[in-house]
Every structure is written in structure tokens, then in C-alpha cells.
């Protein structure tokens, strides 16, 4: 059994790409922590430290940035986010 990964979804309200990223993770049954950057602006600093930027959405798995919705979607098409999650194991 694959160990559970810590998945963060940095998002903003009224962000269509954020909604798509959330929906993809939910569809795949992947547990994630949703961080609303507008409700917790201090987390913007955390996002910038992890990814080098402040754009939303951003997906981070076990402290490693995956990217935004486009990158998440590409990973899903290439074998599923589940595969990407398990690839994070080192």
C-alpha cells in the first residue's frame, strides 16, 4: 500500500483553475489540505517559499511543488495523480 502523501492546494476564491484542481483531486479520491490565500494572507509567504511565486492554484506534494492546474492535469493524463503522488517517495 502506498503511504499517504501530504497534498496542499493553495487556492483563491472565484478562481476557475483552482476549482478545476480541487475537482480533479476530489475525483481521484486524493485527500488534500485546501489553503485559501485570501482568508490567510500569511500563507502567501509559505507559498512563495515553496514555489517561488504567489499564483494560484499551486499544488504541493510532500513539500515538492507540482505546479498549477495545467501541470496537475498533465500528470493526471500521464498516468494519474496517484502515480505522481507515489513518485514523490524517495
Regions found by a protein language model. Give the residues of each.
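Thioredoxin-like thiol-disulfide oxidoreductase module
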Residues: 36-54, 83-87
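Local sequence-structure signature of Cys/Sec-based thiol-disulfide redox active-site neighborhoods
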Residues: 1-33
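Generic recognition of short, well-ordered alpha-helical segments
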Residues: 19-20, 45, 70
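Non-catalytic interaction surface on structured domains
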Residues: 22-24, 29, 49, 74-80
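Non-catalytic, surface beta->alpha helical segment in thiol-disulfide oxidoreductase systems
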Residues: 61-90
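Short alpha-helical
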Residues: 16, 42, 67
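Structural signal for short hydrophobic segments within the conserved structured cores
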Residues: 33-35, 64
Amino acid at each position: 500500500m502506498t503511504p499517504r502523501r501530504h497534498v496542499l492546494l493553495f487556492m483563491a476564491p472565484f478562481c476557475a483553475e483552482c476549482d478545476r484542481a480541487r475537482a480533479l483531486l476530489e475525483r481521484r479520491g486524493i485527500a488534500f489540505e485546501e489553503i485559501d490565500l485570501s482568508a490567510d494572507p500569511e500563507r502567501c509567504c509559505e507559498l512563495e517559499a515553496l514555489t517561488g511565486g504567489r499564483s494560484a492554484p499551486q499544488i504541493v506534494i510532500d513539500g515538492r511543488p507540482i505546479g498549477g492546474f495545467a501541470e496537475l492535469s498533465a500528470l493526471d493524463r500521464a498516468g494519474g495523480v496517484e502515480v505522481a503522488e507515489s513518485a514523490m517517495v524517495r
